[in-house]
Design a protein with these regions (language model features):
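Short boundary motifs at domain starts and secondary-structure transition points
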Residues: 1-6
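Nucleotide-activated donor-dependent transferases that construct or modify glycoconjugates
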Residues: 9-21, 72
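Short hydrophobic segments within beta-strands
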Residues: 14-17, 48, 75, 104, ...
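Glycine- and acidic-residue-enriched helix-capping/strand-helix junction motifs
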Residues: 19-30
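N-terminal cofactor/phosphate-binding cores enriched in small/glycine residues
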Residues: 33
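Glycine-rich beta-alpha loop elements in corrinoid/cobalamin-binding modules
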Residues: 36, 44-174
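Radical SAM [4Fe-4S] cluster-binding motif and immediate context
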Residues: 180-219
Length: 219
């Protein structure tokens, strides 16, 4: 493996279709990771919300082929995204053989299966905000897969095909969980306004989708 020596790699983060009907609810995980990457100086980072836009598979591949990302991040937040992720990774590998494919989300719990049965190269095993930034920083200088062993929160197959799972990074603080650059969606014309009653019960329900809110250190 030899990565391209870019000062700023081109990165595209994509979602996967979650349900039969598209949803305009903001994809918090993807947005949070993109925010952190941009803050770290990786300004050539872009978002393709497949779950909302619902392009055909052919349109998705055509878009990625045109954009030529150096790193493709797949946000797979549900286990049912496996079939789509597998199909997407193989198709991308065929048309963009030099693109590094990085996966995050709950599907990463099945890291060994994904790494051995798909064309995904690396998996974020926990929170992606720190891992994604550290991963891209290491990508800039790595010569082999083994060079990624110091990136926390990462899973991959080394040069000998052995599964490597690195330690988790320190969790982000409660203040950072929703520290998101909402202009990412606004610039794409994909932002929606969510209004709720001004009481704690409603607010807890509205933002109750992220299990990290239950962590003791974030209460």
């Amino acid at each position: 493996m030899k990565t391209k020596q870019h000062k700023t790699p081109r990165i595209i983060i994509v979602t996967t279709p979650l349900r039969e009907e598209p949803s305009d609810f903001p994809p918090i995980g993807s947005l949070s990771v993109i925010t952190r990457l941009k803050q770290a100086g990786f300004g050539d980072t872009h978002f393709y919300n497949i779950d909302l836009l619902r392009p055909t598979f052919e349109e998705t591949i055509a878009y990625l082929k045109k954009e030529k990302p150096d790193i493709l991040g797949i946000s797979a937040v549900v286990s049912t995204a496996y079939a789509f992720t597998k199909k997407l990774s193989f198709a991308v590998r065929e048309v963009l053989p030099k693109t590094t494919i990085f996966l995050g989300g709950n599907l990463g719990a099945s890291a060994e299966i994904i790494l051995k049965k798909t064309s995904v190269d690396y998996i974020c095993t926990g929170e992606g905000e720190k891992t994604a930034v550290d991963f891209v920083c290491r990508w800039l200088t790595a010569n082999t897969k083994n060079d990624f062993s110091d990136v926390k929160g990462l899973s991959f197959l080394d040069e000998n095909g052995q599964l490597i799972v690195t330690p988790d990074p320190e969790p982000i603080s409660k203040e950072e969980v929703y520290d998101i650059d909402w202009s990412i969606l606004d610039d794409l014309g994909q932002i929606s306004t969510y209004v709720t009653r001004a009481d704690s019960t409603a607010i807890d329900h509205s933002f109750g989708h992220d299990p990290r809110r239950l962590d003791t250190h974030r209460k």
